[in-house]
Amino acid sequence: MNLNFSDEQQMLRDQVQKFCESDYSFNKREEILKSDLGYDADLWKLFSELGWLSLPFAEENGGFGYGPIELSVLFEEFGKVLIVEPYLSTIVLSGSVLDKSSYDGRADLIESITSGASHISLAYLEEGSKNNPAFANTTIANSAGSLTLNGTKTLVLNGGNASKLIVSAMMDDELVLAIVDADAEGLSKITYPTIDAQSCAEISFENVQLDNAAIISKGSESIDLLNNAINIATLCISAESIGCMTACYL
């Protein structure tokens, strides 16, 4: 079994490593964390220009079609300097859901995040969910084609900066995922930092009106999409942790 990086993977690693060493000092990171956004918008645009935001998306969705190994390479280098830009929330979690979905509007949404123009956050955790992606007290009432969203989501990574949210909810006795404008009437946010200074939010929905085109997936597809996104995110966080430990002890 060949466990060596391919030439492309090694080139990616060298590129990310060079950026992190030359452009992402600890002082730079501290300045970013003190900003209103909690990330550097110019660096995020640079990530797009370098192609990093397109790495994991399928070629038919405008990406490079790379997989978990390339994401591990990226996150291990990110971990060495504790990069705070919202790659995990926008590209890995929300991006994975969109990339693997059969949603008709996925192409435009993916283009909006790979271009660096917008952020989308995944809102699936709730009080009492215990990390079970199939759990949802949040509901979407379906009355004669009119959809009304109610509920509260916790630990929404980068939720304060997102222009759209992917929200899990129960509708007609099955789990659905819906795309929701972050400035929708009836939506409110409480933002706060996580223990590692990442931006997070608790988001409440009170009679938020949606149309049928907002539904990304239903039933087992929703659960499969969430599980896949969480699995990839877990891998990325593990690689990031290796990078952290490497920087500390080697």
Regions found by a protein language model. Give the residues of each.
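Internal helix-loop-helix
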Residues: 48-107, 111-116, 158-161
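A structural signal for short hydrophobic beta-strand segments in well-ordered beta-sheet cores
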Residues: 138-141
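Residue-level signal for inorganic ion chemistry
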Residues: 9, 20, 74, 151, ...
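Short secondary-structure junction/hinge motifs that connect adjacent elements
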Residues: 27-49
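A short core secondary-structure module
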Residues: 150-187
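A short, Trp-centered hydrophobic/proline-enriched beta-strand micro-motif
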Residues: 116-127
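Glycine-rich beta->alpha junctions and the first turn(s) of the following alpha-helix
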Residues: 4-12, 79-80, 93, 187-250
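Short Gly/Pro-enriched turn/cap motifs at secondary-structure boundaries
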Residues: 87, 128-131, 155-158, 192-196
